[in-house]
C-alpha cells in the first residue's frame, strides 16, 4: 500500500489570500491569522499576495480568477457571514460555499475555505482568534497541506494497462 500525504512545510510555496471586506472586524483577524500561519510554516512575505473583494458573496469570482492565474500553489478564501433577521444569510453562505467548492474541483492549485458562517458577531470573533483559535490560520495550514499532497499526487506514475 502506498500512502501519500502533504507535509506542513510551506517553504517555496506561493499563496493567494482572497479576503472579503464586509464584516472586516472579523475578516481582518482571519487574514492576520492566515498570514501568520503561512509565515510560521515557511512561506516568505513576498510569496503571499492578498486580494480583497467587497463581500463573501463576491469572493468565489475573485478566488476563481486568482486560482486560474497559475501563479499560486494555493489560494485561501477568507470571509464571514453573520446571521441576521432575514434569509439573506442562507443565500450568501450557501452560494459562497458552493462557489469555493466548485473552484476547488476545477483548479490545479490547492483551494482552502476560511469562511465563517456564524449566528452572532461574538461567535465570529471567537473563531477569528479571540477564543476558539483562528479559522483563517487553520484554512492557511490546510492549504499548505493540500498544496503539498497535490504535488505528491502529480508524481504518482500512471498504472500500466494490461495488453
Swiss-Prot record:
Query: Quick one: which residues bind (2S)-2-hydroxy-3-oxobutyl phosphate?
Result: 85-86, 127
Instruction: Report if keyword Transmembrane is assigned.
Output: no
- The answer to keyword Translocase applying to this record is no
Which superkingdom, per the lineage?
Answer: Bacteria
Stored Pfam families? DMRL_synthase
Q: Where does 5-amino-6-(D-ribitylamino)uracil bind?
A: 22, 56-58, 80-82, 113
Q: Where is the active site?
A: 88
Q: Name one GO cellular component term.
A: riboflavin synthase complex
Which UniProt keywords are present, listed alphabetically?
A: Riboflavin biosynthesis, Transferase
Q: Which GO terms describe its biological process?
A: riboflavin biosynthetic process
Biological pathway: Cofactor biosynthesis; riboflavin biosynthesis; riboflavin from 2-hydroxy-3-oxobutyl phosphate and 5-amino-6-(D-ribitylamino)uracil: step 1/2
The EC number of this protein is 2.5.1.78
Reaction equations catalysed = (2S)-2-hydroxy-3-oxobutyl phosphate + 5-amino-6-(D-ribitylamino)uracil = 6,7-dimethyl-8-(1-D-ribityl)lumazine + phosphate + 2 H2O + H(+)
GO molecular-function term, one example from the UniProt record:
6,7-dimethyl-8-ribityllumazine synthase activity
Instruction: Name the protein family.
Output: Belongs to the DMRL synthase family.
Tell me, in a sentence or two, what this protein's role is: Catalyzes the formation of 6,7-dimethyl-8-ribityllumazine by condensation of 5-amino-6-(D-ribitylamino)uracil with 3,4-dihydroxy-2-butanone 4-phosphate. This is the penultimate step in the biosynthesis of riboflavin.
- What is this protein's name? 6,7-dimethyl-8-ribityllumazine synthase
Gene that this polypeptide is encoded by: ribH
